Curated annotation (Swiss-Prot):
Coiled coil: none
Stated name of the protein: Potassium-transporting ATPase KdpC subunit
Primary subcellular site in the record, as a coarse category: membrane
Any one GO MF annotation of this record: ATP binding
Membrane topology, as annotated: Single-pass membrane protein
Biological source species: Paraburkholderia phymatum (strain DSM 17167 / CIP 108236 / LMG 21445 / STM815) (Burkholderia phymatum)
Protein family per UniProt: Belongs to the KdpC family.
Its biological purpose: Part of the high-affinity ATP-driven potassium transport (or Kdp) system, which catalyzes the hydrolysis of ATP coupled with the electrogenic transport of potassium into the cytoplasm. This subunit acts as a catalytic chaperone that increases the ATP-binding affinity of the ATP-hydrolyzing subunit KdpB by the formation of a transient KdpB/KdpC/ATP ternary complex.
Gene: kdpC
Subunit description: The system is composed of three essential subunits: KdpA, KdpB and KdpC.
Keywords (A to Z) from UniProt: ATP-binding, Cell inner membrane, Cell membrane, Ion transport, Membrane, Nucleotide-binding, Potassium, Potassium transport, Transmembrane, Transmembrane helix, Transport
Length: 193
């Protein structure tokens, strides 16, 4: 009986050391040396102060800023601790109310492009409720409002949007997108500079 326990204990100790200590230590060292920024949350700093992450959206509702997707987290928007599945079904009355509320906010802000449908990502939330990016169509839809609020030329704001529009990942995966935080920070810099 004793002869059975010794190999089990040795195997347990070896696997615990490998999977609980060695593997996490190697992966942490690899992440910190090769992917330092990503391993630490892809933080964005301005003037030595962290202002956000490229990976988690932030609440912007002032007219001089581009607005991101709706956040479905609670008790406050873009709360990473409250992230969970948030997709409502197409016939759910709560989704219709959410869309109507966001449409009303967009109309109240003014400066909608004539004859252009509101992009769906401006009136619906993402699956996680934390999406930091919008489609180029959603950014283009807001250019006139942002330019008017900042007293900037529409073409200047459009050029900044173009500069911050990223294509598909590796040219294949996903869709083109614009990081809202990076775009808004670039607009602040352009207006100051």
């Amino acid at each position: 009986m004793k002869s059975l326990f010794r190999p089990m204990i040795v195997i347990f100790a070896v696997l615990a050391a490998l999977t609980g200590l060695a593997y996490p230590a190697v992966m942490t060292a690899f992440g910190q040396t090769v992917f330092h920024n990503e391993a630490n949350g892809s933080m964005i700093a301005k003037n030595g102060k962290v202002v956000g992450s490229r990976l988690i959206g932030q609440q912007f509702d002032a007219p001089q800023y581009f607005w991101g997707r709706l956040s479905a987290t609670s008790p406050m928007p873009y709360n990473a601790q409250g992230s969970s599945g948030s997709n409502l079904g197409p016939i759910n009355p709560a989704l219709a109310d959410e869309v109507k509320g966001r449409l009303a906010a967009l109309q109240a802000a003014g400066h909608q492009p004539a004859g252009v449908a509101v992009p769906v990502d401006l009136v619906t939330s993402s699956g996680s409720g934390l999406d930091p990016e919008i489609s180029p169509a959603a950014a283009a839809y807001q250019i006139e409002r942002v330019a008017a609020a900042r007293k900037m030329n529409v073409s200047d704001v459009a050029a900044i949007v173009d500069r911050y529009t990223r294509g598909r990942q590796f040219g294949v995966f996903g869709e083109a997108r614009v990081n809202v935080l990076e775009l808004n920070l670039a607009l602040d810099d352009a207006q100051r500079g």
